[in-house]
């Protein structure tokens, strides 16, 4: 349940769907397996293993999951069969095979193999935090996060969500914190960061498991590099990497949160319920504190 990486989107809290409405809409876009000549299939699936429901509600949070199944048909397999067929035609009919005919043969081979191809599946989860008005997506890759947002919009007939656009850039804030050797409020420097310079060939410096206040680290900023990723700890509850795109990576929920969830969950459902609430509340509160140090949202 605990998301290890997060992209998030501010939502219009006045226009969020109720759990039953969301479930009904997602049922119309439920996942089905690839059929026949389909290369892939995508749809919503149960977010928890102990329930078939497409929405898992926990207090002010709603959890959903998008599943994608893709056919695996290696290009090398198609190429080998195509070469065999071309050689067979050349030997049996004593003629060359042109580009157009090769393309037609390739398409025929693909159509023959596709129904029997192996599949691989992936899923992206998201939690609506209706109290704070955030959609938290368990993926820091923009393409994956945008995809589940798009699918939710399609299923709901619209969803007012925006990119997290603050008055000050995360990179500027992180660079300032590293330069001054400390953070503001409930944040502390951890032990990892990434810095980038400028120029035709952009120099990149990655620092891992080091004291970020050390002179050799700070000197990179003084030499003109900016921080693009920074390891932070928030109120002794969450350790994470903040990126210049305002995504969170390598999230670790420290013992205090894990223990609180375990004390409130007697079984799988209870633990999932408690973990979902604690994760959504702590992460959203942390994000709001970050937004305040970034000058608030752009108008």
Swiss-Prot record:
- Chief subcellular location: cytoplasm
Which residue spans traverse the membrane?
Answer: none
Q: Which GO terms describe its cellular component?
A: cytoplasm; nucleoid
* Sorted UniProt keywords: Cytoplasm, DNA recombination
InterPro entries, per the entry? RdgC
Domain of life the protein comes from: Bacteria
Q: Where found, per UniProt?
A: Cytoplasm, Nucleoid
Q: Name one GO biological process term.
A: DNA recombination
- Pfam families in alphabetical order: RdgC
State its role: May be involved in recombination.
Family designation: Belongs to the RdgC family.
Protein name (record): Recombination-associated protein RdgC
- Source organism (scientific name): Neisseria meningitidis serogroup B (strain ATCC BAA-335 / MC58)
Lineage of origin:
Bacteria, Pseudomonadati, Pseudomonadota, Betaproteobacteria, Neisseriales
UniProt gene name = rdgC
